[in-house]
Amino acid sequence: QADIFAESSHGMSVLSCIGMNRPDIMTGTAPEASFWLLRSEDEYSEHLVEQDYWSAAVEFADSVGVDVINTSLGYYSFDDKSKNYKYRDLDGRHALMSRQASHIADKGMILVCSAGNSGAGSWKKITPPGDADNVLTVGAIDKRAVLATFSSVGNTADHRVKPDVVAVGVGSDVIRTDG
């Protein structure tokens, strides 16, 4: 059986930016917060059903009283290429997870979504659920405030500005599984 903690360090790196509480080493932005760690991603394939997994994780988070959700994933390309999203689909309503994200935001939860890592590729655009209404979509900049080449960009198909904010995502100190 695979070790989910060793398969990918991205979640741990993001968590360390938020929750690390070792003043002698690193202090995150919310060091006193408590966390539920939920994983919905199948790292080895891309299928529409992963949006169902994500929606179930978000519903679980709601059921246990989570106030803020950070999600560092998004989808636009699938193993079955006929399911790939088009730019016109980035309207906050087409993708299941975008509708779910809006629903969660309407309930009063804060949902923070990555803009995506497609800025240097042919897609370039943000990915669902980052196109959803009332979610905070975050792009990446370097320490000189220059947009990271990998950071996906907006706008949405219905002309909303995304990402909403940017944060340092290049050259940041983070905790990783490989030390």
Locate the predicted segments by residue:
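Extracellular S/T/G-rich loop segment that most often corresponds to the catalytic His/Ser-adjacent loop
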Residues: 1, 127-179
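Subtilisin-like serine protease catalytic core
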Residues: 1-50, 64-67, 80, 106-108, ...
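Hydrolase catalytic cores
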Residues: 15-18, 38-42, 125, 169-179
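Glycine-rich, acidic and aromatic/proline-enriched surface loops and short helix-turn segments
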Residues: 20, 67, 71, 167-171
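Solvent-exposed loop/turn segments at secondary-structure junctions
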Residues: 41-44, 75-78, 117-121, 141-145, ...
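Short acidic, glycine-rich surface-loop motifs adjacent to enzyme active sites
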Residues: 61-91, 114
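Anion (oxyanion) recognition and catalysis
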Residues: 62, 102-106, 166
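Active-site glycine-centered loops adjacent to acidic/histidine catalytic or metal-binding residues
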Residues: 101, 116
